[in-house]
């Protein structure tokens, strides 16, 4: 699967927000000038059209979860077929991804690192190996580390970092057993208020 290999902080500056490419423990504001676009004329931000605002919001969320355009559009189509609010359904589908849940638990210090753990068969779902990052986790699922991966220093380091963060209320983590339980699908109020999913729906509805 293709992925972005360029400078991560440049994307944060383009979207004018922290996309959590780093561990999230130390602020990146000193390194990342959010008030400036990347490039030679980054200080000259132009006023965006309605379409531009919608596009930037879509790009921000897509990059936050590390999703390529075609897959992101498929998530939108799936969300539009589900009952309820399409925008909220879209966010829930993204949150239910195994790589994202792995990150939320704290096994990976970033979503990219969590995705790599899943791809390398280090993650178990209900004691079964799952190596598909987009796998949809269900309420009640137990996410743990493969026994051959428990001694990986980076997983332990990520867990130590995650203990400094607040664990999402829809996830229960047992740091001693190195496992997490996906208790429920998050409610919209549980997720970031900085995401405006309605702009994304307006963009794709055109």
Curated annotation (Swiss-Prot):
Residues 96-156 form the S4 RNA-binding domain. Signal peptide: none annotated. It comes from the Bacteria. The keyword rRNA-binding applies. It holds the Pfam family S4. Keywords: Ribonucleoprotein, Ribosomal protein, RNA-binding, rRNA-binding. One of the primary rRNA binding proteins, it binds directly to 16S rRNA where it nucleates assembly of the body of the 30S subunit. With S5 and S12 plays an important role in translational accuracy. Belongs to the universal ribosomal protein uS4 family. PANTHER family: 30S 40S RIBOSOMAL PROTEIN, SMALL RIBOSOMAL SUBUNIT PROTEIN US4M. This is Small ribosomal subunit protein uS4.
